[in-house]
């Protein structure tokens, strides 16, 4: 009976072991999915139906570098965009703004075109001297200045983020096949693929969020691991702003910092990001995007070829870049430095001396209007003695100090001196106070610039805050730059972060929620002022106030610390008491966060290696079961059969015989 029971138990254990071997891997893998995607996405492969996949939190990354099928595009420079509209950190108190004599004019006062359109210093000097002569006649032009409202439309498009992935299949010792992701790296796709993606996406209609796997999973082979590679594409639905330039070309600007992409192409590629849009969405027929900003009289300078509009603070080259025809503005000229204007008429204006002589020869009853006009011109030219002296002085200063980078208000308008190839050249600029900081703040650390936007034209530009002017074609070149790394190092040491403006320094102190202002006391920064009150002052229509700058840069600095520095900091040997007190509330949650993160990473590692773990566990279980069910009973039976028989001793006592073993006899004795 005992043998039958043992045989039944043995057969049952063998049957259970066989079932475990056959179905064990499949059961475990059903709870350990290798493929996942962000929530809301769907799977698509060429020739395959849409398939829902489980949700995972992050895009899988790996140090494994797969075979490179296409050349990797160079990195695209990007500005840091940290502050959001809802991430507002309060300024600790109004006293943090600094002393009461903080200059209020902390905004760019001028805009300058491409610095390649410059005049040699001697040529500028000749023009300056000519403007001071009361005996010289001038060619006067009636000019209307125009601006372009470049925003045409806001359309819906798609942003694609491309990764090149590598997967491999592995078959375990008991036949279970698993597929694992071993490589996922950002990579740009060739235009041939992008064109096909664009056609497919636009034909499918309104795709909100999607993910495409553009390669097949590797097949399973018991004797070798099989690899498969291809593109994984994430698709996001976004809004795109379509702009128009002065000659009517549609384009998209700043998809990445400083980018300019033609609308007619239908897509743009920067790094591993692709933007796609429908080119049939925007029509510009009979629409007007020009707006007249000024109507004034300007002087033409034969020496430099510049048109000088003193009353509006604009100087520009008379050389034409192109002419355009607008349905609402008519014929317009575009100068080589980008000013849009139209000449309404020209006339020769006699010199002040000639006009005075003419009036003296005529009847004294000419009228008060002419007399007032004459008196105004006489007083205007009283400054000619100062004017010529200032031309001489400026030429000497700029010749000996060619590194000057301040826009100067000269007798012929605002000019910027710059140095190129060892020579000082002059660039005409415009008084343009309509620039404001764009929010959320975009700060470029490599060049210490802030992105600003013109309230009239909505044009965006980068402002190098150490200067009083904007260079309209300046671009940002931030991409993990040394400058940004130095800022992070200073934050790790709890040191001040300084933003140097052209009128002083804004200092943001740890824990980066308060600031103070230091005005330049040595007066090395020259104030761009007007010569006489007769010249119109700058019209600060939309000033960037110090409060505005302070709040935005404090928010920006604090965000960088919270995102890039604080999460990666461990314990330090010396920690200020203010830091301990200020962050004691976050210590507990931070500890829990790291514990949860550690548990999650451990669980993620287990799920990634579940097939190997299951194989090992199955082998261990089989060995244990084999030992308990098969080997142990056999050993037991074998060992029992080998037990030695004890000799029997026969003892007789009073006629009775008893059988004793040797041990019993020994005990009896």
Curated annotation (Swiss-Prot):
Family (UniProt): Belongs to the nucleorhabdovirus glycoprotein family.
Major location (coarse):
virion
Native organism = Rice yellow stunt virus
Please, which domain of life does this record's source organism belong to?
Viruses
Task: Give the membrane topology, semicolon-separated if more than one.
Answer: Single-pass type I membrane protein
Q: Which GO terms describe its cellular component?
A: membrane; viral envelope; virion membrane
- PTM details? Glycosylated by host. Glycosylation is crucial for glycoprotein export at the cell surface.
Q: Does the keyword Transmembrane helix apply?
A: yes
* Segments crossing the lipid bilayer: 610-630
The residue range of the signal peptide is 1-24
Gene name of this polypeptide: G
Q: Share what the entry says about its subunit structure, partners included.
A: Homotrimer. Interacts with matrix protein.
Q: Which residues lie on this side of the membrane: Virion surface?
A: 25-609
Q: Does the keyword Glycoprotein apply?
A: yes
What name has this protein been given in UniProt? Answer: Glycoprotein
Q: Which GO terms describe its biological process?
A: symbiont entry into host cell; virion attachment to host cell
Instruction: Describe the function of this protein.
Output: Attaches the virus to host cellular receptor, inducing endocytosis of the virion. In the endosome, the acidic pH induces conformational changes in the glycoprotein trimer, which trigger fusion between virus and cell membrane.
Places the protein is found: Virion membrane
Q: Enumerate the UniProt keywords alphabetically.
A: Glycoprotein, Host-virus interaction, Membrane, Signal, Transmembrane, Transmembrane helix, Viral attachment to host cell, Viral envelope protein, Virion, Virus entry into host cell
Q: Which residues lie on this side of the membrane: Intravirion?
A: 631-669
């Amino acid at each position: 009976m005992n043998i039958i029971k043992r045989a039944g138990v043995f057969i049952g254990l063998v049957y259970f072991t066989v079932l475990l071997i056959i179905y064990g891997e499949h059961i475990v893998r059903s709870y350990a999915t290798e493929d996942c995607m962000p929530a809301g996405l769907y799977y698509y492969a060429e020739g395959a139906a849409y398939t829902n996949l489980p949700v995972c939190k992050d895009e899988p990354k790996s140090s494994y570098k797969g075979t490179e099928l296409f050349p990797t595009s160079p990195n695209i420079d990007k500005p840091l965009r940290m502050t959001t509209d809802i991430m507002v950190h309060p300024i600790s108190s109004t006293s943090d703004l600094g002393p009461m004599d903080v200059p209020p004019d902390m905004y760019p006062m001028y805009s300058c075109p491409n610095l390649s359109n410059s005049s040699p210093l001697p040529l500028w000097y000749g023009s300056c001297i000519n403007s001071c002569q009361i005996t010289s006649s001038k060619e006067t032009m009636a000019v209307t200045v125009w601006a372009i409202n470049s925003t045409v439309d806001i359309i819906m498009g798609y942003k694609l983020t491309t990764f090149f992935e590598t997967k491999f299949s592995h078959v375990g010792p008991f036949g279970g096949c698993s597929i694992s992701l071993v490589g996922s790296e950002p990579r740009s796709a060739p235009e041939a693929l992008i064109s096909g993606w664009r056609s497919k996406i636009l034909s499918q209609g309104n795709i909100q969020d999607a993910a495409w796997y553009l390669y097949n999973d590797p097949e399973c082979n018991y004797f070798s691991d099989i690899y498969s590679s291809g593109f994984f594409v994430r698709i996001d639905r976004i809004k795109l702003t379509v702009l128009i330039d002065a000659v009517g070309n549609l384009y998209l600007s700043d998809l990445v910092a400083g980018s300019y992409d033609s609308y007619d192409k239908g897509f743009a590629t920067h790094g591993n990001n692709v933007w796609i849009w429908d080119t049939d969405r925007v029509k510009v027929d009979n629409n007007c995007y020009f707006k007249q900003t000024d109507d004034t009289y300007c002087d033409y300078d034969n020496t430099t070829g510049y048109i000088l509009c003193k009353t509006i603070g604009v100087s520009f080259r008379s050389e034409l870049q192109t002419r355009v025809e607008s349905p609402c503005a008519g014929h317009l000229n575009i100068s080589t430095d980008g000013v849009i204007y139209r000449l309404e008429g020209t006339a020769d204006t006699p010199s002040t001396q000639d006009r005075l002589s003419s009036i003296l020869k005529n009847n004294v009853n000419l009228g008060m209007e002419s007399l007032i006009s004459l008196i105004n011109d006489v007083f205007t030219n009283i400054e000619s003695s100062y004017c010529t002296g200032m031309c001489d002085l400026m030429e000497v200063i700029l010749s000996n100090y060619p590194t000057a980078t301040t826009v100067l208000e000269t007798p012929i308008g605002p000019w910027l001196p710059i140095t190129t190839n060892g020579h000082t050249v002059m660039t005409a600029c415009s008084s343009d106070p309509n620039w404001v900081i764009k929010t959320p703040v975009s700060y470029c650390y490599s060049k210490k610039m802030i992105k600003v936007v013109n309230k009239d034209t909505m044009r965006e530009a980068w402002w190098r805050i150490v200067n009083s002017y904007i260079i309209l074609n300046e671009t940002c070149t931030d991409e993990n730059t040394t400058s940004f790394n130095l800022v992070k190092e200073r934050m790790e040491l709890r040191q001040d972060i300084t933003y140097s403006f052209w009128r002083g320094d804004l200092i943001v102190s740890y824990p980066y929620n308060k600031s103070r202002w230091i005005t330049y006391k040595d007066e090395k920064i020259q104030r761009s002022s007007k010569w006489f009150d007769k010249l119109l002052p700058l019209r600060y229509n939309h000033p960037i106030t110090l409060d505005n700058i302070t709040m935005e840069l404090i928010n920006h600095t604090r965000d960088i610390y919270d995102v890039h520095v604080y999460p990666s900091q461990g314990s330090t040997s010396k920690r200020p008491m203010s830091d301990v007190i200020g962050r004691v509330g976050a210590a507990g949650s931070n500890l829990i966060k790291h514990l949860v993160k550690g548990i999650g990473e451990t669980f993620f590692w287990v799920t990634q290696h579940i097939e190997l773990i299951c194989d090992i566990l199955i082998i261990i279980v089989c060995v244990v079961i084999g030992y308990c069910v098969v080997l142990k009973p056999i050993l037991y039976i074998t060992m029992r059969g080998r037990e030695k028989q004890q000799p029997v001793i026969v003892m007789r006592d009073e006629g009775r015989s008893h059988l004793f073993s040797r041990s019993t006899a020994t005990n009896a004795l």
